[in-house]
Amino acid sequence: MKGDMGQENKQAPDISLDSVASYSCEPGLMSIAAHLLKDGCTDMGSFVVSPACLYIAIETLTRGAKGETLNELESVLGGAEARRDACSLLFAKCPEQTASDYRLAIATSLWANKFTSPLRRNFGRTIADLHGKAAEVDFESSEAKALMSSWLSKNTGGKFTSAPEMDADTVFAIISALYFKDSWVDPLDDEDIEVVFRAPEPRSDVAMMGGFGSYGHLLSTREAIAVSWPMQSGAVAVFAMSNNGATLDDFVQSGAAWDAILRCRMRMGTTRPKGGIELFVPQFELRSDDRDLGGMLRSLGIEKAFLPGADFGNITEADAMVSKVIQGTMLKLDPNGAEGAAYTIFAVPAGCAPESMPEPVRVVFDHPFAFAIFSHSGAPLFVGVYRGA
């Protein structure tokens, strides 16, 4: 009998999420992803942010910090071993088997005021393994804006082409960037889809897509339903929704959404239904510009970097403190696959199917849900929620 998940809630054996919850609470990349998902869900609309892009910007700042400022930043990144592990995920070798248009590019840059805060001689080498660039510029000149914009466009696949204006008193600015594109293993179809997305405020313009796949994994607990949908490179999209009547806000804020996403990504307690999965999910393009992430970083425990007396002596001798942290992000999901880009700025002033198949498990994401996109190595590239608008 065909299982339809999404039209109504189905009870399922409860699966303990303790180990996943512990993993996501440990300082580091996954903890940052969990906090970003919760922080963004305080908005009323759909949103998308990039944990990976933010992490690289923090890592760049950390490599320039000293003393108590360094200790505080390291406590958020999880220490030396966790930092190495995170960078290994983010800069993992490109898989050999990919779609022709596959791309995952992550990079960072630091732009210092050539007049007031010349760079330490070897800082460029310090961030070389992060695909990093370090340069001294005149922030009052049009040339500086052009250089930063060119770098940003190159490293976001042309999705973001204009770097923000920097004040003349800027000591240095960090810009990290990410671009990702991949194709589904099992493409989805956007024609003759009769499923209607049930947003809090009904909308008729939410285009759905659906299709059958044999390679996805299904997580079904009393709290959540989650589905992973793989891409050609080994990257995967994970969609998660409440299975107990909880609102999307409660589902996300309780941590249940991220726990379900991680468990599904890690294949802990998941199944691959013998009949495959018939997935229905909206196709969408989300974009956010200039999202302020400073408050979220403070909630993680980063305080000294924002205060006078912050020590970034491995970057420059000049006194400096972080004044703002902003991120721009875009993510498009369509029947062919996923494409996304992001930038983060720290501004610092002074298998084969069997012949006889059971029917697939039908999973319909027809009401608000949380989602994440992971790279082939497991790095969380994007997290967000979709409400239909």
Where are these regions (language model features)?
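Detector for small/aliphatic-rich hydrophobic stretches
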Residues: 1-139, 150, 386
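Short Gly/aromatic-enriched secondary-structure transition segments
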Residues: 73-77, 188-196, 248-258
